[in-house]
Swiss-Prot record:
Organism from which the protein derives: Enterolobium contortisiliquum
Record protein name field: Cytolytic protein enterolobin
Annotated family: Belongs to the aerolysin family.
Keyword set, alphabetical order: Cytolysis, Disulfide bond
Disulfide bridge positions per record: C34-C98, C183-C189
SMART domains: Aerolysin
Length: 485
């Protein structure tokens, strides 16, 4: 439908497609349509268009009214609407809600970023040939319990756990099991490394039999933790990682390459911060945090009936893509849920050949949900990789993926970008110069000329000597930064 539908009054269940500059023009009026084909238009969505952090009245007071239609975003009236000028603060049709159409899959350049399907992801990682696309394991959806991983000699094997074994009051999952439960040639072991989960009551799911590829272990166990009323610790889940004495990788044993250590604080979903993660680190066993022990237990408090995901993965995952995939698209849509000034901090160095320190860190520690799609340019050497890191996911800083120099980066949502470089570069409000070439900000899918989208400089790099080499730019929603290297 056309934009003038709003002028004439919305028809129940009708989708109104409008311009990109306001999501209110993309609305649906209906009793329950929001829950099926649309997303609710609330204060968090409005925040990506205009600062409405004090949205305690109808939205015409904040410049968001559209053709006599106003939306209430305060608690208790979320997504309600009424006509402008009505005397009551109650919605004129309280059974209706205002929504906006669910966005389509993000597009980076002309390459469509496919929707994430766990089954497809697992199949690609574990069953395809060496030359096939390898996607990073999704590490950034704020797992409730924490992380464990195994790594050795910068090499990797991908293998998902077999069906969990219920043993008394424990659930045991064995890593890297080959045919008939025997290890293949890559792992010379009799007693395999095992994760033991002391459960309350679990309903387990599994991704089926594992498939071994090259040299990394990755597996996931998913279950529900229910309160066990027969014990005093009725809301406690015990997660314990054990390591067999004779567990070996090739010719190297845990005594000289594999260690067991605790990881950093993890933000538990319903509680305060608790240190619940465990790391099997590649370092001398006797130098790890828990030297001389093979078991580490943590006791996070688990609310009644909560889903528990236990992931095992490498600390560093390397992704190689086909030659025609060269864009990077970072989708931050799920970050902007609780309001607030979400900021991201990007650091860049002129010396990628000697320093792996291209970091992407969360500037605001309150951000907990983040999704990532990464595509890299092939045929680059390791000396040209930069590293992307995300802060406050499971570790203070977690290296997610090593990738070659990027071509384009897209952000969905308002954010602050800071580029740091050396030298007295001349920077205009329209084109952002950088040592490796240039960065043009443009609106997607319709670029606004060669100078890109005009952006407001929150902090000019030439404003003072202390900030001479730093540029901070506020970017409106749905812009793409094209980088040519």
């Amino acid at each position: 439908t056309q934009r003038d539908t709003l002028t004439k009054g919305m028809t129940q269940g009708q989708i109104v497609a409008g311009p990109d500059d306001t999501k209110i023009d993309q609305s649906i009026m209906d009793q329950g349509v929001c829950a099926t084909i649309a997303l609710p238009f609330d204060i968090h969505v409005a925040q990506s268009v205009k600062n409405v952090m004090f949205m305690f009245a109808w939205t015409q007071k904040h410049g968001l009214a559209v053709n006599n239609l106003v939306i209430l975003g305060v608690p208790g009236y979320l997504n309600m609407w009424k006509r402008f000028g009505e005397s009551t603060d109650e919605p004129s049709e309280s059974s209706k809600r205002c929504c906006y159409e669910k966005p389509t899959d993000p597009v980076s350049g002309e390459i469509v970023t496919p929707a994430f399907d766990p089954a497809d992801e697992i199949s690609e990682i574990t069953h395809q040939e060496e030359s096939a696309d390898i996607k990073p394991v999704r590490l950034l959806d704020a797992r409730l319990l924490g992380y464990t991983w195994v790594t050795q000699n910068h090499s990797w094997i991908v293998a998902y756990s077999d069906e969990p074994i219920k043993d008394g009051n424990e659930v045991v999952t064995l890593r890297n099991i080959g045919n008939n439960n025997f290890c293949d040639a890559l792992r010379k072991c009799t007693d395999k490394s095992a994760c033991i989960h002391q459960y309350l009551q679990f309903a387990w799911n599994s991704f089926g039999d594992p498939t071994v590829r090259t040299r990394q272990v990755v597996f996931e166990v998913v279950g529900w933790a229910d309160s066990d009323t027969t014990n005093n610790n009725s809301d406690t889940l015990f997660y314990r990682t054990t390591q067999a004495d004779n567990w070996q990788v090739l010719t190297e044993s845990k005594t000289n390459t594999i260690g067991l250590a605790e990881v950093d604080w993890f933000n538990f979903k319903y509680e305060t911060k608790q240190e619940v993660s465990i790391e099997i680190a590649r370092q001398t066993w006797t130098s790890t945090l828990n030297a001389g022990v093979s078991t580490v237990s943590r006791v996070p408090k688990v609310p009644i009936k909560v889903k528990i995901n236990v992931d095992t993965f490498l600390k560093v995952l390397f992704a190689v893509y086909k030659a025609d995939l060269y864009d990077i698209f970072l989708q931050f849509a799920s970050v902007f849920k609780k309001g607030g000034n979400r900021q991201y901090w990007l650091n860049y160095t002129q010396e990628p050949n000697t320093k792996s320190n291209y970091n992407h860190k969360i500037y605001n520690d309150k951000i907990r949900y983040l999704q990532e799609d990464v595509q890299v340019h092939p045929n680059e050497t390791q000396s040209k990789w930069w590293w992307w890191s995300f802060k406050k996911v499971a570790l203070t800083t977690m290296t997610v993926v090593a990738l070659t120099r990027f071509k384009a980066s897209g952000i969905n949502g308002q954010y602050i970008s800071a580029r740091q470089f050396s030298g007295g570069e001349t920077v205009s409000p329209y084109r952002l110069a950088a040592p490796f070439d240039s960065c043009l900000w443009r609106r997607s899918p319709n670029p606004l000329g060669t100078d890109g989208l005009k952006v407001a400089l929150a902090h000019h790099p030439l404003a003072g000597a202390s900030n001479r080499n730093k540029l901070r730019v506020s970017i409106p929603a749905q812009c793409i930064c094209s980088i040519t290297a």
